[in-house]
UniProtKB/Swiss-Prot annotation:
Keyword Transcription set for record: yes
Family as reported in the entry's similarity comment: Belongs to the paired homeobox family.
InterPro entries (UniProt xref): HD, Homeobox_CS, Homeodomain-like_sf
Sequence ranges of Low complexity compositional bias: 11-21, 124-141, 148-194, 243-267, 406-417, 425-441
A molecular function (GO) term: RNA polymerase II cis-regulatory region sequence-specific DNA binding
This protein's encoding gene: oc
DNA-binding region, residue range(s): 67-126
Keyword Iron set for record: no
Entry protein name: Homeotic protein ocelliless
């Protein structure tokens, strides 16, 4: 006892001022001096290091050499108090340190050192985290895709894998589409989309989750596709479409449509149908458009208000009038066209995304150029636009009826100009109404929208189609659902809005700045105009 006492209390080298409830030693010495609450763990404490040396030299502090302070171990309670203070401030002033030191029975110097060490630890952790993040990001960049298409493909794979419980085809097709995206953007995409259509039937069970996953993947892909020019978007769309967004009913009808009508229909049917079911996926959106063109889908969900199209139109005017946008949006919107055009007939079948891909550049361009050349007469442009929704036009003569352009193609009016009033039967929308209504019905226009928003380029086709269809959108009163009904699919709307900066309240209703936001703030493109050729900068397609 005496030894423990002397050691802890009397030895100069070991002042107890350091130790609060537990002295500097991890294992307290023998019975602590009177003021020390901690019980001793051993009669004389466990001598360690210098302590033992000090003892050997003399019981009464003969060792005058200043000994090193023992490492302080903090109790859990002390650490809790210190951590709480550290959470509030990393640099407590002297008063705070003293207050805490009193509270936890430690010398202020220990508190100060603890804070210094804690800050160093925090910096180290941040540094490690940044390094790991940079490593992971570099890996993603290299592996996930030197090309955006890679990223989109990975996104698609993700969505597919989510869906893949239902349809392994989904994964294959979408991943196939993605992989082929760059090299054989058109064929690969169309194939993948086709598979998507086929597998969508299988995926139906996964539809919702798959659709969501597909949508997410599509969104990612779309964002990247903006960079990759549709290729990734297509695959993403295909993946999303096949991703199980299809509903079995839609799938079946779509597939049937594929069988009977233009490849466009089929592609839309396959991809679109599946999409209709899972309005979430961007691919579904595109496919939905195709399906719409084919008028195959029975889903009456969302007739698209003319205005809703206008935002898209703004985006639509992409430079890639043909090939590129054709492939991605064409897949969706172009899918329909492909069938009539005959360009992507086979390809279009799958998702409709592929369809767009196959569409010839002329066809893709034709809707816009033709319309423009024709003086904006929808009818005139329509037959050319068959590439985009030719099948729809063919099957539905109403599409051809001159609905009048929503806004003259040449119009230089600002992008923000809302499309024709949303009035269901606005004459302008007459031609479009029929087409769009059907597309909306069959293809969840919102899905289409999401696809459109998903990728600027791809959306071009899609929107182009939309534009074409759009005039007819109001033509069919029966097909046209009320604005509210249109928005009833809030999921879709919000989803689209997330990408385009529209708000549900203003989506198709008003030419608010959010409209402009589409160009400036759209998630899919920082500067959508960069993708547009001068003639395409009539953002006001609608």
């Amino acid at each position: 006892m005496a030894a423990g006492f002397l050691k802890s209390g009397d030895l100069g080298p070991h002042p107890h001022s350091y130790g609060g409830p537990h002295p500097h030693h991890s294992v307290p010495h023998g019975p602590l001096p009177p003021g020390m609450p901690m019980p001793s763990l051993g009669p004389f404490g466990l001598p360690h290091g210098l302590e033992a040396v000090g003892f050997s030299q003399g019981m009464w502090g003969v060792n005058t050499r200043k000994q090193r302070r023992e490492r302080t171990t903090f109790t859990r309670a002390q650490l809790d108090v210190l951590e709480a203070l550290f959470g509030k401030t990393r640099y407590p002033d002297i008063f705070m340190r003293e207050e805490v030191a009193l509270k936890i029975n430690l010398p202020e110097s220990r508190v100060q050192v603890w804070f210094k060490n804690r800050r160093a630890k925090c910096r180290q952790q941040l540094q490690q985290q940044q390094q790991s993040n940079s490593l992971s990001s570099s890996k993603n960049a290299s592996g996930g895709g030197s090309g955006n298409s890679c990223s989109s493909s990975s996104a698609n794979s993700r969505s597919n894998s989510n869906n893949n419980g239902s349809s392994s085809n989904n994964n294959t097709q979408s991943s196939g589409g993605n992989n082929s995206n760059k090299s054989s953007q058109k064929q690969g995409n169309s194939q993948s989309s086709q598979q998507g259509g086929g597998s969508s039937g299988g995926n139906n069970s996964n539809n919702n989750s798959a659709a969501a996953a597909a949508s997410a993947a599509a969104a990612v892909a779309a964002a990247q596709s903006i960079k990759t020019h549709h290729s990734s978007f297509l695959s993403a769309a295909a993946a999303a479409a096949s991703g199980g967004t299809n509903q079995s009913a839609n799938n079946n009808s779509n597939n049937n449509n594929q069988g009977n009508s233009t490849p466009n229909s089929s592609s839309s049917g396959g991809g679109g149908g599946s999409q209709a079911g899972g309005h979430l996926s961007a691919a579904a959106a595109a496919a939905a458009l195709n399906v719409t063109a084919a008028h195959q889908n029975s889903s009456p969900l969302l007739p698209t208000p003319a205005t809703s199209v206008s935002p898209v139109s703004i985006v639509c005017k992409k430079e890639h009038l043909s090939g590129g946008y054709g492939s991605s949006v064409g897949g969706g919107g172009g899918g329909g066209g492909a069938s009539s055009g005959g360009l992507n007939l086979g390809v279009g079948v799958g998702v409709g995304v592929g369809v767009g891909v196959g569409v010839s550049q002329d066809l893709l361009r034709s809707p816009y150029d033709q319309l423009k050349d024709a003086g904006g007469d929808i009818g005139a442009g329509v037959h050319h636009h068959h590439s985009i929704y030719g099948s729809a036009a063919g099957s539905n003569p109403r599409l051809l009826q001159p609905g009048g352009n929503i806004t003259p193609m040449d119009s230089s009016s600002s992008i923000t100009t809302p499309s024709p009033p949303i009035t269901p039967m606005s004459p302008q929308s007459a031609a479009a109404a029929a087409h769009a209504a059907q597309s909306a019905q069959s293809a969840h226009h919102s899905a289409a929208h999401s696809a459109a928003y998903m990728s600027n380029h791809d959306s071009y086709n899609f929107w182009h189609n939309q534009y074409q269809q759009y005039p007819n959108n109001y033509a069919q009163a029966p097909s046209y659902y009320s604005q509210m009904e249109y928005f009833s699919n809030q999921n879709q709307v919000n989803y689209n809005m997330g990408h385009s900066g529209y708000t549900a309240s203003n989506f198709g209703l008003s030419p608010s700045p959010s409209f402009t936001g589409t160009v400036s703030a759209q998630a899919f493109s920082q500067n959508s105009l960069d993708y547009m050729s001068p003639q395409d900068k009539y953002a006001n397609m609608v």
